[in-house]
């Protein structure tokens, strides 16, 4: 029972390492609690402890799913609570798998298990969670370190590299607690090496400025989600963004949020967007507009970002939100959603590789909504893309943890790629992030705001931009695989000796 409580407590604590709280030290302490109960557990017990940890981690950390479904998604309280509980129960399977893998593969000393096997198993299952069934890489532990020295690893090995070092640090802290004086000295020295050594990467300038800084304006309309799609509000909403844009012709680039236009592009092109584009060209300004886009051929709907200005272009969202923008396993699940009276949009995913949008004289890497939480997907436009743009509408989640957690992920994308991130949202967090992942300017949440600041286009490539997630994932998968093979070989050898004649 004590081990179960420790595991659950560790999971409950972990979300406080992330935004909006930012108690980064909680992350290694939380993992250290989990590793402690795994040390003396069987594989099945370790899976149970991992599952309890996951229930605490996601039950607190993604509680905003209920807010989205109940307050803004049209679900009744019981359906929203039930589906949120099912989602948390599913996510908790991944820490459970990490426990099973870590103990199954992790024979040997405390140091071998806490420094090699457990951290590697944790990272592998985090990666799996971010890939399986379209992926949900939320609350990956590396994000908790966006304001610590470990962040310096991100341009080299990405968020998984940061997460792996963090898990190793948790193992070192646990070893310092459990081992004798000699082992404790080794563990503390190792922790110092990790903390000090990782900061040395901050001295390397992986990317460099390309041209002069550019004045940009990010529009935050603060349109309430329950009013956004009302037909009678369409004209008022679009006119508001047009008026805000006209007040900032002194900027080189102006960005509207995701689906800032609550109508299809074709419905507002002539009445609003074409005249605005003509004005933008006269002033030498480019405007990026978030708008749904309809293609009659094939009857397809896209979540799009459209460029108005010198070089018109379109970007169609590639990574759609399951159950929000498309329905997986439609023949089975459509019936369930009908019973629960949950409305669902049905968009088409854009092509994996699309021509980069051009704005303010440079190619950019666009992402819409939660596409920016997938680090690997931000790399498809590098090194050509000079800066990152993310447009989103986190009004779906109200004043919950979600907008702050999402902002933290955008900061990691800037850090990994060595590029500025321009982030325009409906209600927040809207801001400019520099190439080192540091906020330059941030608009207050839940206010109508036009945030103006300077953005520096960048050139060059970080190691992560060249390699992606594969070195970190390959290392961790290799550790788990080698330890598995070694333990099986030792078990087979032991059985063989027992079977030899003459042995008692």
From Swiss-Prot:
The chain crosses the membrane at residues 6-26, 47-67, 83-103, 105-125, 153-173, 186-206, 465-485. The active site is at residues 258, 317, 369. Keywords: Acyltransferase, Cell inner membrane, Cell membrane, Membrane, Transferase, Transmembrane, Transmembrane helix. One of its GO terms (cellular component) is plasma membrane. The keyword tRNA-binding does not apply. It is found in: Cell inner membrane. InterPro entries: Apolipo_AcylTrfase (IPR004563), C-N_Hydrolase (IPR003010), C-N_Hydrolase_sf (IPR036526), LNT_N (IPR045378). It comes from the Bacteria. It is a multi-pass membrane protein. Its EC number is 2.3.1.269. CDD domains: ALP_N-acyl_transferase (cd07571). Pfam families: CN_hydrolase (PF00795), LNT_N (PF20154). GO terms for molecular function: N-acyltransferase activity. Residues 219-457 form the CN hydrolase domain. One of its GO terms (biological process) is lipoprotein biosynthetic process. It is an enzyme of class 2 (transferase). Pathway: Protein modification; lipoprotein biosynthesis (N-acyl transfer). Gene3D superfamilies: Carbon-nitrogen hydrolase (3.60.110.10). NCBIfam families: lnt. Belongs to the CN hydrolase family. Apolipoprotein N-acyltransferase subfamily. Catalyzes the phospholipid dependent N-acylation of the N-terminal cysteine of apolipoprotein, the last step in lipoprotein maturation. This is Apolipoprotein N-acyltransferase. It comes from Methylococcus capsulatus (strain ATCC 33009 / NCIMB 11132 / Bath). The gene is lnt.
